[in-house]
């Protein structure tokens, strides 16, 4: 909310482009933060028009994907964090880590490491491939913000959110297939592996 209320323009006016004027920039930024925490994908502002810090918060919310106890697919991430926290706490107190009467040992932690590494590998690989071939991107902004737009698209697909920075021509075969791959890798390995 703070980042939306300060102006970075020469006119010292609020940047209201892309925001819901009925609610103002503070409520729009709050909704942006909440909608990316609970994986519902609804918007009342264009996230691409938000201030840089507001966009970063939305991106971080989807990367964590376990705020508010992990609603939706975030519940899977929440359970992974729970297993990891129990394992680390068990190591710190010198006991064999247990959760619900079941021991958590090296085998389970190796599987958790695989699940945790799927997120950055999937998102960064798809982002790199998309940016390497500019014809695939369909980006309206060829500058540094293009990286944010592509990264946000894949993070949103992986986190099962559905929002986007929307500077992309993303109704193409490449975007449909690559975001579908990110969506599948965001949902099913966390159900199957642990």
Residue ranges and their predicted role:
Residues 5-73, 137-186:
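P-loop potassium selectivity filter motif centered on the GYG triad
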Residues 1, 104-119:
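Alpha-helical transmembrane segments and their helix-start/interface "positive-inside/aromatic belt" motifs
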Residues 119-126, 186-190:
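Alpha-helical transmembrane segments of multipass membrane proteins
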Residues 130-133, 190-194:
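Membrane-helix cytosolic exit motif
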Residues 1-13, 93, 97-98, 127-139:
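Juxtamembrane/interface segments at transmembrane-helix termini
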Residues 42-110:
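Long hydrophobic segments that form regular secondary structure
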């Amino acid at each position: 909310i703070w980042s939306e209320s300060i102006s970075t323009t020469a006119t010292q006016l609020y940047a209201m482009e892309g925001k819901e004027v009925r609610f103002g920039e503070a409520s729009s930024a709050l909704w942006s933060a909440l909608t990316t925490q609970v994986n519902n994908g609804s918007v009342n502002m264009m996230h691409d028009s938000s201030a840089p810090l507001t966009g970063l918060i939305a991106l971080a919310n989807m990367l964590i994907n376990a705020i508010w106890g992990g609603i939706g697919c975030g519940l899977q991430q929440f359970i992974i964090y729970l297993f990891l926290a129990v394992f680390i706490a068990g190591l710190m107190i010198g006991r064999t880590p247990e959760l619900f009467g079941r021991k958590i040992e090296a085998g389970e932690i190796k599987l958790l490491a695989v699940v945790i590494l799927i997120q950055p590998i999937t998102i960064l690989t798809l982002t790199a491939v998309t940016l390497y071939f500019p014809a695939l991107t369909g980006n309206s902004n060829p500058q540094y913000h293009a990286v944010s737009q592509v990264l946000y698209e894949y993070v949103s697909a992986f986190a099962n959110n559905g929002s986007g920075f929307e500077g992309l021509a993303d109704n193409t075969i490449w975007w449909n297939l690559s975001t579908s791959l990110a969506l599948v890798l965001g949902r099913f390995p966390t159900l199957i592996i642990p």
